[in-house]
Amino acid sequence: MDKLKKMIKNFIQITDHLVDLIALILILSMMSLSGYMLWDSNQVYEKADAKVYEPYMPTRNHSKSFKELQQINNDVIGWLKVNNTHINYPLVQCENDDKYMNTDVEGNYSLSGSIFLHAENNPHFTDFNNIIYGHHMEKHMMFGDIGEFTNQNFFNKHHYGNLYYDGINHGIEFIAIMQLDAYNERAFNVCISEEAKQEYIKLIDNNSLYKRNVQISPNDHLVILTTCTSDMTNGRNVLVGKLTNKTYPEKIKKNKGIGIDILNNNTYLELILILIALIIAVFVKKRKNN
């Protein structure tokens, strides 16, 4: 009988240790996965931060660094900046629009992708509607700020941007903001004929959430910035601007990037590591006591 009791006691102890071990493994696995997800999220947003590309940005008296970027990737054709927003990125173009959905401007795989000109557009911006795509991301990354223009107060305060191409800075005067279906063929095809251009002008007039009193003619060169929106099924936010010979220097603030957000995420990672260490210490102590 004593032998049977001892066997039962040993079995219970082994089972108890086994349950503790399984629980520890599950907790550590979940915490490790959470830590990895935070780290991976950091990597995506770090690559999407406009500050990463600032050293390559062409300036009035210096474009050498931009040419160096073009040597790294000859798909780089220009630079887009929307004043007083976080949109301040190199611009790329290739024969396949899908490529830069998940490729950065240096040609590396990246979930944040790049800001890219529609493959069917002329890289010298001689078309009537020049369509530029970018991911809508949180933390104001990539084209995340396009959605801000659907707020009338924001739209009213943000009029200008700049587009650098062919070695020259050109101004952009933003005219309208629209929300359209992604499958709207008129909106996302390059207009060639005069009829198509007139139809595009009507599209803007009839679908703008907000529009400035600026005339558009078929002889203009429009810059169409488009990105996803969750406000409607298959929705796209479409910011319409017009190229001008006048440039518009930014007057207020520079892009501050995502340093604070990254710091917060790194703090979370440190807390996870501390908790893992504490859990292991408690488990070891419990085993010793037993």
Range-by-range predicted roles:
Residues 1-16, 290:
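N-terminal Lys/Arg-rich, disordered targeting/topogenic segments
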Residues 11-265:
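Solvent-exposed, non-transmembrane regions of membrane-associated and secreted proteins
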Residues 255-290:
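C-terminal single-pass membrane-anchor helix
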